[in-house]
């Protein structure tokens, strides 16, 4: 009580709580200064699109409904109780009956939707004015405010006497529960506070609006409906208090504000939240999770209102208990929730994630809320939440940039598929003339786009990316029978394997296993390796094995993990051991190709196919080696694999001609350095491997993360194209096959794939 008294006195004495009610003005100022950053840019441009749409709308008004309240005054707000429907046993359907959790579409014909449209438009326009300083947005917002609240011919009477009526009951008068309809005014007033600095919103407008809300506040405090709502024991009472405090804040009624704040913990929180965090009144509903989150969100709103006072209300520990009770079900299926939730599970899960993020802003000691929110929140960057509350990190910005590019690329791909009449064509790189190079599903690069789309879904949780990933993944299914390719790991694990990891769906698992069976047919135990290319004359090579093939072993390791059949694992280990024995030089660098005598497995020669010369250091090949042996250690914990990965890393970063940004030249022995082409794909592969390697090597973890962080940062800052260019690829400056004069200094899809994987692993390493 002493702490509450202090808070009340503090608020009363200083009389200077900031003008904003829930929004944080310093945060908005920070956003305004960084609108060029990808996350904010996407949210901002969507906001402006909505504001432009609002400019074209006529101001909503209560006078537009085609039905009048029982009072006979069309200025009286009128809405239907959401869950009440006509009684099918009565000829006239009266009185309506309750179907809890089922919304009656009739409510759309009255004032509720118009109130929502108006408050949303005012908030949108106010934010658009704040971020752009363009008076047209403020003028439209003020027009809507005047129409709804001030102009005599169109204004709403300051009451909710006919809110949420139940036709056929109580003379069609409103119910106390109807006061929840006006909760939308709370956030709208944040927009109003922003408009106070505009030219359009005059001092008379401010005076008139405050007069309206003073009368509305008085009605809430003295009317039968208001008093009954105040006596409720669930989210309605919470929402009632938040509204009273917000309107008192706006109108300068300190007495009411202080009184309600001083009683809130005792009257609302202690009566609604059990010691273990359960909210019994909400848990009895058919939408128990949703209403529990709804009430929690209202309480957080109140804590944000008082945040600007520099104090905290006493109830934070109990509020956190309520959050903790719900948070344990984030990421789980609805059937794991022990109460009812007949619909809207995913939406309410996301709403809770946003609430947890706001709770973290109120108490930075609860970093677990931040981690949980960032792990599960749907990153639909157009969501206003990302403008009003979210503080994005570098990974958020990188994925937001990737979203812009990949949406653009999917448009380009779809157009070309129609032109070429082949729905299975996949994007690989950019041609010399700037056009998009498309390849068939048999190309070793065909699976990377699907993998990128799955990683976009993994990070954002946006269903759009899952839909795109599913569609593009199944186009590759026939590859599971493709015994002519050693690259089934690239083609099928980076698509179907990632899909199975993220979804657990049996259909993806089945394809992965068949692809592994097919890949295993390319293994010859006399050589101890999986054969790479099937093409090539005997004078060129008899049984070529390339370092790239290390990457395909993941498919085999996974097949054994999923089935318990050691056959695939044994092949992978044999291949890794033989490659480790024959592919590496004493300094830890690797050859590109080793040619074997197929009859006895003896080495015929060590050469290159994509490097500058046989003894050169082809950069992407070193990346395959580092990544491949790190991955092998993950599955086997064989220290020899860890040692090989370390040794190649040590060699790699000892290169005297390594650029300062750690994005290598395509071949580190090219005499044209520093004018030689770079290879961003090699950098992305190595960075991704380093994040994983750091988790296995405590001694060098800090060094490996330092290297990986630097590479990731430089790829983000200096190797990305302008949005809507480069055919939608994410990275510039990769090199495919320099000796063949093909794909030199261009965007390539595998660079993008390992770049996104790098970002995901970086985010995980921070946790």
Language model: regions and residue ranges:
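Aromatic (Trp/Tyr) and acidic
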Residues: 80-83, 87-114, 171, 306, ...
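Short linear capping/connector segments at secondary-structure termini
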Residues: 161-170, 280, 427-434, 473, ...
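Active-site cradle of extracellular carbohydrate-active enzymes
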Residues: 156, 160-163, 175-290, 586-608, ...
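Alpha-helical junction/boundary sensor with strong preference for TPR arrays
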Residues: 132, 152, 224, 268, ...
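A glycine-biased, small/acidic residue-tolerant capping/turn segment at secondary-structure junctions
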Residues: 334-343, 719-738
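Bacterial Sec-dependent N-terminal signal peptides
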Residues: 1-20
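A beta-strand-loop signature enriched in Asp, Gly, Thr, and Trp
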Residues: 264-290, 297-325, 639-704
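Extracellular glycan-targeting catalytic surfaces
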Residues: 18-226, 262-265, 303, 307, ...
């Amino acid at each position: 009580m002493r702490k509450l008294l202090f808070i009340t006195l503090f608020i009363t004495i200083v009389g200077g709580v900031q003008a904003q009610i829930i929004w944080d003005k310093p945060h908005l100022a920070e956003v305004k200064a960084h609108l060029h950053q990808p996350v904010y840019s996407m949210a901002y441009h969507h906001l402006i699109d909505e504001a432009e749409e609002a400019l074209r709308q006529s101001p909503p008004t209560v006078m537009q409904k085609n039905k009048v309240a029982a009072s006979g005054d069309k200025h009286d707000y009128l809405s239907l109780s959401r869950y009440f429907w006509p009684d099918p046993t009565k000829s006239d359907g009266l009185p309506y009956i309750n179907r809890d959790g089922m919304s009656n579409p009739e409510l759309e014909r009255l004032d509720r939707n118009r109130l929502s449209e108006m408050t949303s438009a005012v908030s949108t326009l106010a934010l658009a004015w704040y971020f752009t300083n363009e008076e047209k947005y403020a003028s439209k917002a003020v027009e809507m405010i005047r129409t709804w609240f001030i102009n005599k011919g169109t204004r709403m009477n300051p009451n909710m006497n006919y809110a949420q009526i139940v036709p056929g009951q109580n003379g069609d008068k409103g119910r106390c529960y109807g006061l929840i309809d006006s909760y939308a005014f709370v956030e709208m007033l944040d927009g109003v506070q922003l408009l106070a600095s505009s030219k359009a919103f005059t001092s008379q407008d401010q005076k008139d609006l405050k007069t309206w809300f003073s009368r509305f506040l008085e009605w809430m405090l003295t009317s039968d409906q208001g008093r009954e709502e105040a006596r409720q024991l669930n989210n309605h009472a919470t929402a009632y208090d938040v509204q009273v405090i917000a309107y008192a804040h706006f109108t300068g009624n300190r007495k009411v504000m202080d009184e309600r704040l001083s009683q809130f913990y005792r009257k609302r929180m202690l009566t609604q939240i059990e010691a273990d965090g359960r909210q019994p009144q909400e848990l009895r509903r058919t939408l128990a999770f949703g209403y529990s989150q709804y009430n929690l969100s209202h309480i957080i709103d109140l804590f944000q209102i008082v945040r600007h006072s520099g104090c905290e209300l006493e109830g934070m520990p109990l509020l956190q208990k309520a959050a903790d009770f719900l948070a344990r079900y984030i990421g789980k299926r609805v059937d794991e929730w022990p109460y009812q939730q007949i619909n809207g599970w995913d939406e309410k899960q996301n709403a809770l994630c946003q609430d947890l993020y706001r709770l973290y802003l109120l108490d930075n000691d609860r970093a677990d809320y931040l981690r949980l929110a960032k792990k599960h929140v749907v990153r639909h960057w157009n969501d206003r939440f990302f403008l009003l509350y979210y503080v994005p990190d570098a990974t958020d910005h990188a994925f937001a940039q990737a979203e812009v590019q990949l949406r653009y690329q999917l448009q380009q791909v779809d157009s070309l598929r129609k032109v070429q009449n082949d729905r299975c064509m996949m994007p690989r790189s950019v041609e010399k003339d700037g056009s998009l190079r498309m390849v068939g599903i048999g190309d070793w690069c065909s699976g990377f786009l699907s993998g990128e789309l799955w990683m976009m879904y993994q990070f954002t949780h946006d269903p759009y990316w899952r839909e795109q990933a599913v569609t593009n993944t199944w186009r590759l299914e026939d590859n599971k029978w493709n015994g002519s390719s050693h690259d089934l790991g690239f083609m099928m694990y980076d698509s179907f394997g990632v899909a199975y990891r993220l979804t657990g769906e049996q259909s993806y698992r089945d394809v992965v296993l068949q692809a592994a069976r097919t890949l295993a047919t390319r293994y010859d135990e006399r050589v101890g390796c999986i054969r790479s290319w099937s093409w090539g004359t005997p004078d060129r090579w008899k049984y070529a094995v390339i370092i790239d093939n290390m990457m395909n072993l993941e498919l085999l390791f996974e097949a054994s993990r999923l089935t318990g059949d050691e056959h695939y694992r044994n092949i992978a280990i044999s291949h890794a051991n033989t490659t480790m024995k024959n592919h590496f030089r004493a300094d830890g660098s690797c050859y590109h190709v080793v040619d074997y005598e197929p009859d006895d497995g003896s080495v015929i020669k060590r050469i290159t196919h994509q490097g500058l010369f046989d003894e050169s250091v082809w950069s992407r090949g070193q990346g395959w080696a580092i990544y491949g042996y790190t991955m092998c250690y993950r599955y086997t914990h064989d220290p020899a694999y860890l040692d090989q990965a370390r040794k190649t890393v040590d060699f790699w970063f000892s290169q005297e001609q390594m650029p300062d940004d750690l994005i290598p030249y395509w071949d580190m022995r090219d005499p044209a350095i520093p004018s030689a082409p770079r290879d961003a794909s090699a950098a992305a592969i190595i960075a991704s491997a380093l994040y994983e390697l750091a988790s296995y090597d405590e001694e060098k973890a800090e060094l490996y993360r330092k290297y990986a962080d630097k590479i990731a940062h430089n790829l983000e800052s200096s190797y990305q194209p302008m949005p809507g260019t480069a055919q939608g690829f994410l990275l510039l400056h990769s090199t495919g096959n320099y000796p063949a004069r093909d794909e030199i200094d261009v965007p390539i899809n595998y660079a993008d794939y390992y770049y996104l994987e790098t970002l995901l692993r970086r985010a995980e390493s921070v946790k």
